[in-house]
C-alpha cells in the first residue's frame, strides 16, 4: 500500500499484518481521486486547504492521500486502537503528524466535533466494514452532529451489492463499481 499522488507519491504506508482490516486498494483509491479531481461536474470544492474526515479510518490511507494532495488537516475516526496506532505511525512516517487528529469513537454514535477536528469538513470518506449496516448510521451522525460543511463531498465505499440510503440533504453525484466495491459520491447541501 502506498500514497498514489501528491508530495508523498510512491511512499509506502504501514499496514498491520494478519489484520481483519480491508484497506482500499491503491488502484481504487487512485480512481476515487480521479473522479474527485476530474469527474464531478456538480461539486465545486477543492482538496487544496481542505479539512477532511476519514471515518472507519483503518490505516488512514484516504486521509493521508488527501494531505499528500494539498488538504490542510485530516481527522481520523475509528473505534480500534490498532487502527489509530497504524494511522499515527503512517502520519509520523510521512512527517505530517501535526496535520492530523485521531479520535477513538464509534462512528455510529458521534457527538459534535471537538475543536481539534477542524470541522465542519469539506470532504468526508466513509469505508465501514462491508455488510455490517454501519455506513448509514455513521452518515446520519456526521450530518446531525455538524461534522459536514455545506457543499461537502462525501465519498462512501460499500460492498458492490449493498444499497445506500441517505437524507434529502444529500444528492448522489456519481456511483462507480470496482469489482466487489461500490463507491458513491454524495454532495451535502443544507
Stretch-by-stretch model annotation:
Residues 1-190:
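Class I S-adenosyl-L-methionine-dependent methyltransferase catalytic core
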Amino acid at each position: 500500500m502506498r500514497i498514489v499522488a501528491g508530495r508523498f507519491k510512491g511512499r509506502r504506508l504501514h499496514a498491520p499484518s494478519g489484520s481483519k482490516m480491508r484497506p482500499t486498494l491503491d488502484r481504487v483509491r487512485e480512481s476515487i481521486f480521479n473522479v474527485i479531481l476530474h469527474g464531478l461536474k456538480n461539486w465545486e470544492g477543492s482538496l487544496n486547504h481542505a479539512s477532511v474526515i476519514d471515518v472507519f479510518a483503518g490505516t488512514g490511507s484516504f486521509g493521508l492521500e488527501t494531505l499528500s494532495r494539498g488538504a490542510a488537516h485530516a481527522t481520523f475516526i475509528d473505534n480500534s486502537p490498532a487502527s489509530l496506532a497504524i494511522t499515527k505511525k503512517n502520519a509520523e512516517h510521512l512527517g505530517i503528524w501535526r496535520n492530523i487528529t485521531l479520535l477513538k469513537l464509534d462512528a455510529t454514535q458521534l457527538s459534535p466535533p471537538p475543536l481539534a477536528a477542524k470541522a465542519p469538513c469539506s470532504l468526508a470518506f466513509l469505508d465501514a466494514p462491508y455488510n455490517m449496516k454501519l455506513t448509514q448510521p455513521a452518515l446520519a451522525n456526521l450530518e446531525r452532529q455538524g461534522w459536514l460543511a455545506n457543499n461537502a463531498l462525501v465519498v462512501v465505499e460499500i460492498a458492490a451489492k449493498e444499497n445506500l440510503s441517505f437524507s434529502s440533504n444529500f444528492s448522489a453525484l456519481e456511483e462507480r463499481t470496482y469489482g466487489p466495491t461500490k463507491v458513491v459520491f454524495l454532495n451535502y447541501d443544507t
